[in-house]
């Protein structure tokens, strides 16, 4: 029997299968192989005498460590437009982590009622130009909710962003609606409102939302210096046009990315963030 881990706590894993949610423990072989089951894992299980056992963990498409979730395909990167104002450095860190983990990012700008149409257009243009879709939402009033739901189907979606951006309000909107339809599921895995200590998948519209304690680190300096440039989608058209193979768009001459920045084709602030991050990586690793 196959299923997906929707919650794990105290050595027990709750697997959603076609026959319902089954409580399982993991075979000891995983511990010996230093492979621990994660929320989001697709698994093969066996049930004997009413007890479930995880027999196999399928290959993962992605693996987040903090929070610990496997097979995430999409991120709603939630920032408030105002109160607090957008921290572009922090937004760039979230987007870099998404790119590194091959997770499709959608930027969700909350509290859209606090800014003018002109301000919204400027933000949309800025974020579209670096390769990301933007949705304007009002989490408290439910505005933009349907547009988010459309993007959940067939995805495992994580909510991320700074404190105060509206993630909890948005998540509770999904939980409240789903709880009315699937209250028995909530009771089975012991979900209440709403202090998250462990990552958990919530079944929403033929997809899953990750209820998570949050990203406990936004350090991006673990990324290899030669890989960082691939975390910036707007560089893609220029990476192979530089004079030197393997150009990192730093101090190398005749660099197509630097020329694109000078010509206004690549956002200067994004490039400056890239250079700052690259220097952090070089200084930390001493190479």
UniProtKB/Swiss-Prot annotation:
Coiled coil residues, start to end: none
Any GO molecular function: rRNA binding
Biological processes annotated in GO: ribosomal small subunit biogenesis
Alphabetical UniProt keywords: Cytoplasm, GTP-binding, Hydrolase, Metal-binding, Nucleotide-binding, Ribosome biogenesis, RNA-binding, rRNA-binding, Zinc
Residues annotated as binding Zn(2+): 242, 247, 249, 255
Entries under SUPFAM superfamilies matching the protein: Nucleic acid-binding proteins (SSF50249), P-loop containing nucleoside triphosphate hydrolases (SSF52540)
Xref: PANTHER family: SMALL RIBOSOMAL SUBUNIT BIOGENESIS GTPASE RSGA (PTHR32120), SMALL RIBOSOMAL SUBUNIT BIOGENESIS GTPASE RSGA 1, MITOCHONDRIAL-RELATED (PTHR32120:SF11)
NCBIfam families: ribosome small subunit-dependent GTPase A (TIGR00157)
Family: Belongs to the TRAFAC class YlqF/YawG GTPase family. RsgA subfamily.
Name of the protein: Small ribosomal subunit biogenesis GTPase RsgA
Organism: Clostridium perfringens (strain 13 / Type A)
């Amino acid at each position: 029997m196959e299923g997906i881990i929707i919650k794990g706590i105290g050595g027990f894993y709750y697997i959603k299968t076609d026959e319902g949610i089954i409580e399982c423990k993991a075979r000891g072989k995983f511990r010996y192989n230093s492979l621990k089951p994660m929320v989001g894992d697709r698994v093969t299980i066996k049930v004997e005498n009413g007890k479930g056992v995880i027999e196999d963990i399928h290959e993962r498409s992605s693996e987040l460590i903090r929070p610990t979730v496997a097979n995430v395909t999409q991120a709603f990167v939630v920032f408030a437009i105002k109160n607090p104002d957008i921290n572009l450095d922090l937004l760039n860190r979230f987007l870099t982590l998404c790119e590194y983990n091959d997770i499709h990012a959608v930027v969700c700008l909350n509290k859209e009622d606090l800014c003018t149409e002109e301000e919204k257009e400027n933000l949309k243009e800025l974020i579209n130009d670096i390769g990301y879709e933007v949705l304007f939402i009002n989490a408290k009033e439910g505005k933009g909710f349907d547009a988010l739901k459309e993007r959940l189907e067939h995805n495992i979606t994580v909510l991320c962003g700074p404190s105060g951006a509206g993630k909890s309000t948005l998540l509770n909107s999904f939980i409240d609606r789903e709880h009315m339809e699937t209250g028995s599921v909530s009771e089975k895995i012991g979900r209440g409102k709403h202090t998250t200590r462990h990552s958990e998948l919530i079944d929403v519209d033929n997809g899953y939302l990750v209820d998570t304690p949050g990203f406990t680190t936004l350090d991006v300096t673990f990324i290899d210096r030669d890989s960082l440039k691939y975390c910036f989608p707007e560089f893609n058209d220029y990476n192979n046009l530089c004079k030197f193979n393997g150009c990192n768009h730093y101090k190398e001459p005749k660099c197509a990315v630097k020329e694109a920045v000078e010509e206004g084709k690549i956002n200067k602030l994004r490039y400056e963030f890239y250079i700052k991050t690259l220097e952090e990586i070089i200084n930390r690793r001493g190479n």
